[in-house]
């Protein structure tokens, strides 16, 4: 092994002053690499073995390898070794760049002959196209080889649109002149002889790189292949924080502001150093120096890698570093605090400006309110002054109304917020009492309606008071009606006679849309109804010449269901009066007929069955059927009640008291050789006495068909020696005619029902929105032309009451309840419609 490294100085260089002296002392390199198994070793070359210390070596360009031979360069051309003398090893070895260079190499330091070595070729190979490589030939003869051909290439190009002197392509975007080549001066590498750009390149691409940019690019590319094992010093990188970054960050890493209160008195043991340290608060840890103890390596410093030189510890001043860092942190904190304070002041300015605007608006509003209130106060004081008895120009009700209208129009907010009740009590009530002082409601029912309507718009609150929830202290108009208008009504009702109902009804009809609902209910329930009830108790249908319906029925539009308690005593008195009645007396029908639409269908039918039907049955039982001399008075008395009693009751009377005797007379007549023409006239005459509704009843129809069958059997039998000519044909024709009429009537009824069903089906299909039970009842009422509307202010167990025709109902969970005599009875929808008709 060669000892050439011993002749170097501490940095590995030879001493130029002492070329003949050999130094054998231990250098720093020996100490650093004493225990380094990966230290660099020097391998002796052939030249060193031959010439020893006088050999010219360049150990930096050689690298140790495990093989005895150098790897072949397969990129070189094939070289045939001749049998003669072999060239020296120095010519075959290729130089490599050293990785251990410390100083960058500039391009000007290279020798002139620096470049790639000449390609070694044998004697059988010659370089080709030297003239083309050198660029000595001119391009003027480009394409001259076509002189010796037929010019097929040029012709094909012209057929495809090529124009001589222009470029190729659809838009002639191709190059016109061929790319020029420039011959390199020597055999060096690319760039060894400066720029190699041609004149054509300079014309097409005029941008020229400067020498500084080229030098910088060269040094950058060269430094990529360098390796600094000793860790050469790099240029330190500094990080700068701008004021904007500090503002954006808005905080500092350490809270080093003014001394703060201790977070907590907690004992903290720090064992991160060589010795154990005890702190008595968390804030004391932040004041600890961030410098390691003497003799201990920094945690960030790792032990030196094998084969690398250990770096000596840097120069450290922990106190100075701490003070500098403290100054930096304090400066950052001051900047951030100043920015926050500035932002706070700006926000405060904006807030104060908004507050100033709001306060200005509030001030203007308050000034307007004060001005308006001053004007309102002046007007009220003027009214009070004119209300004094000693005033020469007293205030009238019309002038007071104009003042209130002015307050409502021009000073609406103040008028709405003011206590109108006290204002009206003090000003309006005395004038209103004076206005109604001489009023008689029964003589002049419309007196004061316009005045009260005018004051209603001035005094009544926006929210209407519901029935039962009136509050006199909240609405000035309601209090005005109750305290001023109502005493006159009470006084006149106490003097009113219920049988003279028209003036009182007209009076209430005139005021019903003006006075509040609860006041109207109070009048009807507390004043009118007791008078009517007392008068009904004193009524006697046998002695009173005035019918009761003449002074009770006018109250139906106003009172409606309120009159229900009166109906039971009225029916009781009528029943007592009908005990000795005979159907020949038509006055009973005149008395009962007005009540048919007033009483409920059930109560009316029960009254008829109890008091009228037995009398009619007795009358029919006394009827004598005589074809030769018929007295029809009793029959007319019964048939006259057809509209009063139900069809089923009338048919029952006929089946029991009329048809048995009538059929018996027919059979007796047919058994005595009758005149069939007279029988036919007698049959048709009795049938014409009944209405179509009675004839359409199945029982009545069966009885008349039975009579036809008896007549047909009589003419078909051979009983008797003599038969009237044409009698059989006449009876057959009569039977056929009657049966056809029945069939046509039934067909017409079926067609009418089918049309009704079709209309209902179309209506159901047209309405795609599902209905509730109330909507269904409303639809049925429209189909049957029945009035269906709610009763204002009336409820039963919290359910709204409705009028369905002449009956009162309410709806509860899909069930209709009808008002009976004593209780509410559930009923079906069809029964409800039948009762309403």
UniProtKB/Swiss-Prot annotation:
Entry keyword annotation includes Ubl conjugation: no
Compositional bias annotation for Basic and acidic residues: 1-13, 54-64, 103-116, 217-231
Region annotated Required for nuclear speckle localization, chain positions: 710-734
Motif position, Nuclear localization signal: 700-705
Domain G-patch, chain residue ranges per copy: 149-195
Function, as annotated: Involved in pre-mRNA splicing, specifically in spliceosome disassembly during late-stage splicing events. Intron turnover seems to proceed through reactions in two lariat-intron associated complexes termed Intron Large (IL) and Intron Small (IS). In cooperation with DHX15 seems to mediate the transition of the U2, U5 and U6 snRNP-containing IL complex to the snRNP-free IS complex leading to efficient debranching and turnover of excised introns. May play a role in the differentiation of ameloblasts and odontoblasts or in the forming of the enamel extracellular matrix.
Subunit structure of this chain's protein: Identified in the spliceosome C complex. Found in the Intron Large (IL) complex, a post-mRNA release spliceosomal complex containing the excised intron, U2, U5 and U6 snRNPs, and splicing factors. Interacts with TUFT1. Interacts with DHX15; indicative for a recruitment of DHX15 to the IL complex. Interacts with GCFC2.
The protein's name in its UniProt record: Tuftelin-interacting protein 11
Organism: Canis lupus familiaris
Phylogenetic placement of the source organism: Eukaryota, Metazoa, Chordata, Craniata, Vertebrata
């Amino acid at each position: 092994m060669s000892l050439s490294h011993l002749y170097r100085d501490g940095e590995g260089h030879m001493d130029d002053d002492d070329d003949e002296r050999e130094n054998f002392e231990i250098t720093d390199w020996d100490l650093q690499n004493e225990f380094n198994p990966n230290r660099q070793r020097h391998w002796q070359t052939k030249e060193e073995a031959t010439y020893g210390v006088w050999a010219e070596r360049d150990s930096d360009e050689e690298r140790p390898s495990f093989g005895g031979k150098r790897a072949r360069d397969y990129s070189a051309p094939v070289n045939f070794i001749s049998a003669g003398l072999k060239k020296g090893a120095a010519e075959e070895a290729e130089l490599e760049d050293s990785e251990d260079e410390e100083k960058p190499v500039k391009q000007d330091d290279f020798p002139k002959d620096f470049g790639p070595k000449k390609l070694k070729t044998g004697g059988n190979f010659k370089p080709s196209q030297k003239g083309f490589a050198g660029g000595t030939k001119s391009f003027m003869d480009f394409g001259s080889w076509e002189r010796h051909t037929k010019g097929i290439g040029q012709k094909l190009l012209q057929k495809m649109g090529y124009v001589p002197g222009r470029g190729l392509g659809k838009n002639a975007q191709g190059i016109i002149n061929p790319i020029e080549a420039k011959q390199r001066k020597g055999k060096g590498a690319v760039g060894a002889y400066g720029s190699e750009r041609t004149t054509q390149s300079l014309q097409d691409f005029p941008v020229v790189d400067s020498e500084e940019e080229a030098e910088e690019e060269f040094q950058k590319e060269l430094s990529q292949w360098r390796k600094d094992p000793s860790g050469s010093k790099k240029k330190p990188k500094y990080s700068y924080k701008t004021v904007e970054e500090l503002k954006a960050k808005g905080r500092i890493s350490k809270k080093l502001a003014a001394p703060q209160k201790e977070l907590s008195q907690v004992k903290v043991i720090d064992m991160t150093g060589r010795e154990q340290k005890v702190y008595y608060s968390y804030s004391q840890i932040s004041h600890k120096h961030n410098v390691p103890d003497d003799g201990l390596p920094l945690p960030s410093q790792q032990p030196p890698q094998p084969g690398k030189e250990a770096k000596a510890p840097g120069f450290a001043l922990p106190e100075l570093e701490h003070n500098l860092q403290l100054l930096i942190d304090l400066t950052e904190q001051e900047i951030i605090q100043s920015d926050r304070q500035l932002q706070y002041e700006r926000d405060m300015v904006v807030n104060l400006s908004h507050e100033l605007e709001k306060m200005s608006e509030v001030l203007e509003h308050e000034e307007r309110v004060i001005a308006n209130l001053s004007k309102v106060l002046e007007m009220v004081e003027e009214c009070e002054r004119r209300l004094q008895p000693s005033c020469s120009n007293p205030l009238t009700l019309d002038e007071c109304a104009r003042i209130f209208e002015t307050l409502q129009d021009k000073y609406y907010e103040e008028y709405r917020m003011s206590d109108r009740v006290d204002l009206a009590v003090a000003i309006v009530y005395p004038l209103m009492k004076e206005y109604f002082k001489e009023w008689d409601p029964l003589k002049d029912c419309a007196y004061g309606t316009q005045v009260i309507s005018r004051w209603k718009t001035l005094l009544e609150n926006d929210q209407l008071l519901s029935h039962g929830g009136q509050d006199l202290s909240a609405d000035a108009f309601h209090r005005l009606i109750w305290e001023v208008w109502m005493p006159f009504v009470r006084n006149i009702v106490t003097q009113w006679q219920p049988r003279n109902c028209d003036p009182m009804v007209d009076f209430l009809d005139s005021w019903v849309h003006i006075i509040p609902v609860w006041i109207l209910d109070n009048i009807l329930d507390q004043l009118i109804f007791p008078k009517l009830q007392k008068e009904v108790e004193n009524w006697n249908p046998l002695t009173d010449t005035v019918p009761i319906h003449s002074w009770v029925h006018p109250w139906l539009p106003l009172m409606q269901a309120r009159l229900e308690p009166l109906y039971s005593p009225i029916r009781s008195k009528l029943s007592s009066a009908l005990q000795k009645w005979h159907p020949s007396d038509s006055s009973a029908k005149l008395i009962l007929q007005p009540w048919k639409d007033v009483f409920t269908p059930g109560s009316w039918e029960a009254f008829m069955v109890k008091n009228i039907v037995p009398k009619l049955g007795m009358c029919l039982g006394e009827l004598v059927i005589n074809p030769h001399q018929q007295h029809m008075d009793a029959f007319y008395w019964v048939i006259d009640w057809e509209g009063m009693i139900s069809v089923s009751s009338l048919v029952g009377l006929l089946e029991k008291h009329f048809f048995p005797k009538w059929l018996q007379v027919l059979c007796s007549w047919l058994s005595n050789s009758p005149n069939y023409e007279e029988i036919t006239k007698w049959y048709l005459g009795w049938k014409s006495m009944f209405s179509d509704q009675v004839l359409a009843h199945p029982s009545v129809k069966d009885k008349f068909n039975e009579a036809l069958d008896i007549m047909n059997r009589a003419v078909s039998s051979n009983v008797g020696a003599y038969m009237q000519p044409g009698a059989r044909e006449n009876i057959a024709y009569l039977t056929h005619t009657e049966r056809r009429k029945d069939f046509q009537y039934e067909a017409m009824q079926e067609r009418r029902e089918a049309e009704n069903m079709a209309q209902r089906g179309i209506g159901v299909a047209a309405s795609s929105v599902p209905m509730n039970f109330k909507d269904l009842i409303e639809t049925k009422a429209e189909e049957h032309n029945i009035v269906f509307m709610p009763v204002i202010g009336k409820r039963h167990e919290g359910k709204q009451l409705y009028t369905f025709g002449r009956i009162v109902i309410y709806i509860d969970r899909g069930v209709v309840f009808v008002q009976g005599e004593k209780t509410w009875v559930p009923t079906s929808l069809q029964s409800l419609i039948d009762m309403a008709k």
